[in-house]
Amino acid sequence: MCLVWVDWNSRLQFEWSDGDKKWVVMQSGMGKVRAASMCQMIIDTYQVDTFFEFGFAGGLVDILDIGDIVVITGVSEHDVPNRSEIQREQDEWRVRLFQASASSINRFTTALSADPNVTLTKAPVICGDMDVYNREVRDKIAMESGAVAVNWESSAIADVCAINNVKYVGIRVISDLCIEEDSGPIPKERIERLRRSTTAYVNALVDFNKC
């Protein structure tokens, strides 16, 4: 295995080859625009087969806890109202994407499940370029969307993958519960939970690569 570090406009990236498979890792930064541009750049440069997204998210439902892992099964937005015909076309892209990606998503979920310290939920997430730290807003978003978690970038990445016919596997670790008490500095015990979940994700990637 040969690991190579590359600087793409100060975006942390490394790439390595393992047999006939090539892996590329890049840090996009926050927000839909950065995430979408990074995703398209990787697809154009490396002609990828499957795109793995990893990051953190706020939990919208009380059944989730800090450090839980959400395997994304659908995406939507809470901050951009679309005309019905645009939304319909977008929904069709997304349905096709998750159908085409189902095998990869299930394989990766199985790899993650091998870690006894991981709590998994397979469910949709919702996105918007804003932080949510208000219980009423949180509950309203969850009720209207059916999503269990919220973040900034997943819908943009999923749409780029859909347009390019690239399979998508999205994973988010719950870092907060979208309430005011969680808006301050992250306590040490929470950091440890996030670290364990991140380690489980990396281990699952290694196991997925062996398949």
What are these regions (language model features)?
Residues 168, 173-211:
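Regulatory input/activation interfaces that engage signals or partners
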